[in-house]
Amino acid sequence: MLNSFDSAYHALCEEILEIGNQRDDRTHTGTFSKFGHQLRFDLSKGFPLLTTKKVSFKLIATELLWFIKGDTNIQYLLKYNNNIWNEWAFEKYVQSNDYHGPDMTNFGHRALQDDEFNELYKEEMSKFKQHILNDDSFAKKYGDLGNVYGKQWRDWVDKEGNHFDQLKTVIEQIKNSPNSRRHIVSAWNPTEIDSMALPPCHTMFQFYVQDGRLSCQLYQRSADIFLGVPFNIASYALLTHLIAKECNLEVGEFVHTFGDAHIYSNHIEAIKTQLSRNSFDPPTLKINSNASIFDINYEDLELIGYNSHPAIKAPIAV
């Protein structure tokens, strides 16, 4: 048996495996892809953290709080032992004139295929992380990912050079004009795509208030179904909870709309393992602080009753 959250996710995985289009991609890994799909999660029925594999709430929450703070440097994430953005910063470093270690060209694929190289890669990555944590000037130069999510959410710059805080503005709009159809935040800034380590995959979200409940719809242009989407579901569910609390509302639905929803070819066996599992009851979320959303810390968040099957490892496509 599956709970409603795991069931919706499993159905999408099964559909992509059954009818997905086989396509090449930027990473040259290969994918099975479906264009256009929507999932709906009733947040009043629990917190949608998948249970058919263990998903780290800490990684999800600290990344979201990093976005909310407007931060774009992995130093904050590494302080919480959050490594999900490391590869993109590391890639910039090993391509620079300041790097004098072993050749790290195409490190993502080589680490998977060559055990000896993988040990070198892990050693160089470990050194890089310590430099980021302990040397602020190094972190400023090589830990920053460019104008990624947090920058666009909190400090969008228009062509005249004016700065605009989208997240703060949308919260004020929800409070003062709840029926507005303009409760929108966009991370997709076409003029700054080239200055981002990775163009935003989850590109735009909109809020909707009805009967004292706040719902959120995300449009995700590119969705790594196995590794990314379980994080994205929980991240935007958490964002909905935080903004609902900020605006004295209850939570409604999280609606997840996909553009290119894909399973990488080297994730298929991992997906099949997950699909063979039954689920547990979903956990619940408790926010143990009345602080502003902009001052919330990870320690203020409590996930209650999360039981899951073991995690399933799979390579990330860089």
Swiss-Prot record:
Class of the enzyme per the UniProt entry, highest EC level: transferase
Positions with a binding annotation for dUMP: R26, R181, R182, R221, S222, A223, D224, N232, H262, I263, Y264
Recorded GO CC terms: cytosol
Keyword Ribonucleoprotein among record annotations: no
Reaction(s) catalysed by this chain's protein: dUMP + (6R)-5,10-methylene-5,6,7,8-tetrahydrofolate = 7,8-dihydrofolate + dTMP
Gene Ontology biological process terms from the UniProt entry: dTMP biosynthetic process; dTTP biosynthetic process; methylation
UniProt keywords, alphabetically: Cytoplasm, Methyltransferase, Nucleotide biosynthesis, Transferase
Presence of the UniProt keyword Cell cycle in the record: no
Active site per the UniProt annotation: C201 (nucleophile)
Binding site for (6R)-5,10-methylene-5,6,7,8-tetrahydrofolate: D224, A317
Main subcellular localisation: cytoplasm
EC number: 2.1.1.45
Protein localization: Cytoplasm
Pathway stated in the Swiss-Prot or TrEMBL entry: Pyrimidine metabolism; dTTP biosynthesis
MF terms (GO), sorted A to Z: thymidylate synthase activity
CDD domains in UniProt: TS_Pyrimidine_HMase (cd00351)
Role summary: Catalyzes the reductive methylation of 2'-deoxyuridine-5'-monophosphate (dUMP) to 2'-deoxythymidine-5'-monophosphate (dTMP) while utilizing 5,10-methylenetetrahydrofolate (mTHF) as the methyl donor and reductant in the reaction, yielding dihydrofolate (DHF) as a by-product. This enzymatic reaction provides an intracellular de novo source of dTMP, an essential precursor for DNA biosynthesis.
UniProt-listed PANTHER family: THYMIDYLATE SYNTHASE, THYMIDYLATE SYNTHASE 1
Subunit field text: Homodimer.
Protein family (similarity comment): Belongs to the thymidylate synthase family. Bacterial-type ThyA subfamily.
Protein name: Thymidylate synthase
Organism listed in the record: Staphylococcus haemolyticus (strain JCSC1435)
Lineage, uppermost ranks: Bacteria, Bacillati, Bacillota, Bacilli, Bacillales
